[in-house]
């Protein structure tokens, strides 16, 4: 018989830098999960990823205090900022533009994120990412 699921915990944790401090410690502690076990397992799985890159993780907590977790791809906004070497998006996206991104760059990001997106094709994913870029104040070229 399958284990009884008591809840899901969604967090964004920097790659290779999971530690028991907030937000990880309190979130896992509430469910009675072993915090250090998660930190060690997460850091081991994210060794090949660029350190500090925020990764969404979904932790499934079971009734017997065990857990499993799934690491997703980095948020689209982080990948867009990284692609155009930007520190942060525009505070007013309509009037203040902070950079430009090409369709080719968006296609690279779309191929990375496709498994975590609800888009049917790379082209649909590119259009979704273009919307995210525009909302950050980034001009999209070639779309």
Swiss-Prot record:
UniProt-recorded Gene Ontology molecular function terms: large ribosomal subunit rRNA binding; structural constituent of ribosome
Changes after translation: One or more lysine residues are methylated.
Subunit structure: Part of the ribosomal stalk of the 50S ribosomal subunit. Interacts with L10 and the large rRNA to form the base of the stalk. L10 forms an elongated spine to which L12 dimers bind in a sequential fashion forming a multimeric L10(L12)X complex.
Job of this protein: Forms part of the ribosomal stalk which helps the ribosome interact with GTP-bound translation factors.
Protein name: Large ribosomal subunit protein uL11
Entry's family note: Belongs to the universal ribosomal protein uL11 family.
PANTHER family: 60S RIBOSOMAL PROTEIN L12, LARGE RIBOSOMAL SUBUNIT PROTEIN UL11M
Gene name for this UniProt entry: rplK
HAMAP family with a match to the protein in the record: Ribosomal_uL11
This protein's UniProt keywords: Methylation, Ribonucleoprotein, Ribosomal protein, RNA-binding, rRNA-binding
PROSITE patterns for this protein: RIBOSOMAL_L11 (PS00359)
GO cellular component: cytosolic large ribosomal subunit
UniProt KW rRNA-binding keyword: yes
Organism: Acidovorax ebreus (strain TPSY) (Diaphorobacter sp. (strain TPSY))
């Amino acid at each position: 018989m399958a284990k009884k699921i008591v809840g899901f915990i969604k967090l964004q944790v920097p790659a290779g830098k999971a530690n028991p401090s907030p937000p990880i410690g309190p979130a896992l502690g509430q469910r009675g999960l072993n915090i250090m076990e998660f930190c060690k397992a997460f850091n081991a799985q994210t060794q090949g990823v660029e350190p500090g890159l925020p990764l969404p993780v979904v932790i499934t907590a079971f009734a017997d205090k065990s857990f499993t977790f799934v690491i997703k791809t980095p948020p689209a906004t982080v990948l867009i900022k990284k692609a155009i070497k930007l520190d942060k998006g525009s505070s007013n996206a309509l009037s203040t533009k902070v950079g430009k991104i090409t369709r080719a760059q968006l296609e690279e990001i779309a191929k990375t994120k496709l498994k975590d997106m609800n888009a049917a094709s790379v082209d649909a994913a590119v259009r979704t990412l273009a919307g995210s870029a525009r909302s950050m104040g980034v001009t999209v070229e070639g779309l």
